């Protein structure tokens, strides 16, 4: 593995990136809440934390993942989808004394109703119904999808055994992981509208249930007349079991700064509210604006091979990004390393990363993040090599389908490979545009 380092760089935490906590923790010390994590919602940078990687019982904040996967599958089509309540949705909760909306076996429920019931009423039967929906079968299939998403996000301290959060020894997460789960969920179509709704929701009678059901959010921080009200909190999810105690995760915004804050194992309900105020007051007084830092502060050349022969080199660089820095810190307090393999083999996923390290000292959490680096010059390299024959690429490891197609070269010329790569790059850009459109659609 090659390493290239620069003293001036940027910090970026993407979904799936790995964070390594620094030695010194910035931020308030909480006595009545076991763990917390304050994160920049835009970049994923951890701003302050306490025991953020400790594995704890999440209770109903589990439903952030459940709702996120349901929104991802629906792609904004909430009104035309109806779900049928199964026997397991209802009777698997028998004896748990858990929150529910009295769904009945065989009841036909619009997806939109199941979403708001799960978010606002914290309905465990609603969460079961959604798990069957995005899992494509049983509740267990939904739980498997939840854990698959955890793996895709690269989260090391989370495992789910149910979609609702009833405490179980094999059901746990951490404040850092939960903040990242919410950050991912906020990118799914419609999730932010769901997560931030304050108005009462009305569920009309169904084919079996003649009663109209009403859901209202119960977070006192978001109730204007409450002594615990905080203007900056836009959306939230609460959790409680005897084992987990009180958990809380929220999205907050003030003067253009968007934060995610997760707390776990608050001893009392009042601790949950008071500690959240302490954390947000600290965060918004410390981090007031973003600093835009350019990319390309460190670059390196990476050898490219395909069909058993060397094709040349491409350029790898770190991306540019905006980040929140505490007063007294600047880009000079951040370093970047590029991690590269000895060569990039066509047909395999390019394993190129930028590792950014912030030395926050006493002012800010010291962290490192590992993200995908940018590769440029691949198409140009192949164009320059037109006419060179590639031998059968027996040494190519399977990667993503797009890159695998780029590496298939038996009996082909590099000219054909150029066309393939260019087509795939257009396809990739279209996918990115669709993802961007979905991201902006949430507002």
Label each PLM-derived region with a short phrase:
Residues 15-16, 76, 206, 291:
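Residues in and immediately flanking transmembrane alpha helices
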Residues 155-156, 169-172, 176-413, 421, ...:
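Domain-terminus/edge residues, biased toward the C-terminal soluble/receptor-binding domains
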Residues 22-176, 180-189:
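Active-site-adjacent loops and short helices of periplasmic peptidoglycan-processing enzymes
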Residues 11-12, 49, 72, 248:
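Hydrophobic alpha-helical membrane-insertion segments
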Residues 47, 431-432:
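Catalytic-site microenvironment of enzymes
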Residues 3-25, 406-425:
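Sec-dependent N-terminal signal peptides of Gram-positive bacterial secreted proteins and lipoproteins
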Residues 1-5, 58, 111, 399-407:
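Structural motif marking the loop-to-transmembrane transition
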